[in-house]
Swiss-Prot record:
It catalyses: 3''-O-acetyl-ADP-D-ribose + H2O = ADP-D-ribose + acetate + H(+); 2''-O-acetyl-ADP-D-ribose + H2O = ADP-D-ribose + acetate + H(+). The active site is at residue 35. Substrate binds at residues 11-12, 25, 33-35, 122-126. Gene3D superfamilies: Leucine Aminopeptidase, subunit E, domain 1. Coiled coil: none annotated. Keywords: Hydrolase. GO terms for molecular function: O-acetyl-ADP-ribose deacetylase activity; purine nucleoside binding; ribonuclease inhibitor activity. It is an enzyme of class 3 (hydrolase). Deacetylates O-acetyl-ADP ribose to yield ADP-ribose and free acetate. Down-regulates ribonuclease 3 (RNase III) activity. Acts by interacting directly with the region of the ribonuclease that is required for dimerization/activation. It comes from the Bacteria. This is O-acetyl-ADP-ribose deacetylase. Its EC number is 3.1.1.106.
C-alpha cells in the first residue's frame, strides 16, 4: 500500500493538487518566502480574495486557516494558515503549529479535497527550527489521517534537499515510505 504521506523537493506553486497551503502572515496580503511566491504565481485574484476575507473577518490569527480560490495556480484552492513566530519554544509554539496544520487539514476534509501540499510552515522568517517544525508537522498530519479519510494524499513540499531529507527520515522512522 502506498503511503498517504509523501515528501517532494521543489516549488509548491507548480503542483497540481486540490489545495496548496500558504504559510501566510496575519494580514493575508502576501509577503516573503513561500507566501510571496504563491501570491506572485496565483496572480491578482488571490490578493483580491484575501482582501475580501480581511474585510469580512479581519486578520487571520495564529493557528487558524482560511481558504481562497487558487487564481492562476494548478490547485483548486489555497489554504492560508498563520504559523507561530519562534520565541524560544516556551510560548506554545508547538501547540500553535499543530493547530495550523490541523486547521488546514480540517478545511481540506470539509471541502472534500483528496490532496493537499504543505510547505514547512513557520521555518522561514518566523524562525521555527526546521527539525522541530518537521516533527510537529509529521506527527500532526499522521495523527489526522489515521482518523479521517480525506485528504487521501498529503505532500510535504520542501524547497531544499536538506529539509526534504529531514522529512523523509521522519516518515521512515514512523514506518511510512516517503517516496
Amino acid at each position: 500500500m502506498t503511503s498517504r504521506l509523501q515528501v517532494i523537493q521543489g516549488d509548491i506553486t507548480q503542483l497540481s493538487v486540490d489545495a496548496i497551503v500558504n504559510a501566510a502572515n496575519a494580514s493575508l496580503m502576501g509577503g516573503g518566502g513561500v507566501d510571496g511566491a504563491i501570491h506572485r504565481a496565483a496572480g491578482p485574484a488571490l490578493l483580491d480574495a484575501c482582501k475580501l476575507i480581511r474585510q469580512q473577518q479581519g486578520e487571520c490569527q495564529t493557528g487558524h486557516a482560511v481558504i481562497t480560490p487558487a487564481g492562476k495556480l494548478s490547485a483548486k484552492a489555497v489554504i492560508h494558515t498563520v504559523g507561530p513566530v519562534w520565541r524560544g519554544g516556551e510560548h506554545q509554539e508547538a501547540e500553535l503549529l499543530e493547530e495550523a496544520y490541523r486547521s488546514c487539514l480540517l478545511l481540506a476534509e470539509a471541502n472534500h479535497f483528496r490532496s493537499i501540499a504543505f510547505p514547512a510552515i513557520s521555518t522561514g522568517v518566523y524562525g521555527y527550527p526546521r527539525a522541530q517544525a518537521a516533527e510537529v508537522a509529521v506527527r500532526t498530519v499522521s495523527d489526522f489521517i489515521t482518523r479521517y479519510a480525506l485528504p487521501e494524499q498529503v505532500y510535504f513540499v520542501c524547497y531544499d534537499e536538506e529539509t526534504a531529507r529531514l522529512y523523509a527520515r521522519l516518515l521512515t522512522q514512523q514506518g511510512d515510505d516517503p517516496a
